[in-house]
Amino acid sequence: QIEERVKRIPLVKSCEAHHDFSGVISVSVKEYKPIARIVRSTIGTSPFPDQYISEDGKFIGTSPLFTPRIIVTGGPYFDGKRDLQDRRGRTLIPFFQFIENNEFWKAQISQIIVAKDGGIVLIPTLGTTRIDFGLPMNIENKFKKLFIFYQKVIPNKGWNKYSWVQLKYKNQVICE
């Protein structure tokens, strides 16, 4: 009974309970590690509430008691989805993990919008520029290009010079 009650907590991955001969109960719990939070639009077609994405691509419920500091995502891609176990969804997992594990990008990106086709738009914390990341392929190379843009262009042109930065093309950063 204890195991079943603990497993109902949204962030619990697994639970084992046992007692020793003296009657002491021990409970071992493994938690899901959330790497992103899906904020669903009330206008969208999804019947699902906001959820977390775990490190293995499962969607898990939010908790009223705890809110982890993780990246916020949303967009038409998530409408009707129950997990990221399809081919395109599995490409998003390393993308979210990359940001979650990189303190610089975790601080620089406030939101990620995922289009129906899986294309990604980054909303930075500073400025009004939108960053068209494209599909989540060549993740490290695209973030290297963006970092160079931050180092070389932003100091000279300012945060609000460009409305769009495109990273989706190989060996190019296109600014509009």
Mark where each language-model region is.
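Charged, solvent-exposed interaction patches on well-folded alpha/beta domains
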Residues: 3-8, 13-176
